[in-house]
């Protein structure tokens, strides 16, 4: 089963680094708690084209369980603008932190094997 990436974007102005870090660290505990619900990773976005997050889930089902219409309504209320959600299946991942390549979440090659 492929992992799922959801890109969430808000049409909002770029924040200062200080505000972006403050916002991210204040909500990080919520997302750390989602590890048991399939969230592998969340990266917070801050740029000229808006703000948001990139979520890597263990499956589309896990992502859909989190990103319900109720959740989108909650985010809309919090940020004052409705987010755009873009969904992707990801079949192949190169993870340089772990030194491996994964297919559908399963390691198929370690960095030492690739270098040989």
Describe the residue ranges of each PLM region.
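Short S/T/G/P-rich N-terminal loop/turn motif that feeds into the first structured element of a domain
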Residues: 1-50, 60-68, 79-116
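Conserved RNP beta-strands of RNA recognition motif
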Residues: 53-57
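Short arginine-rich
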Residues: 73-79
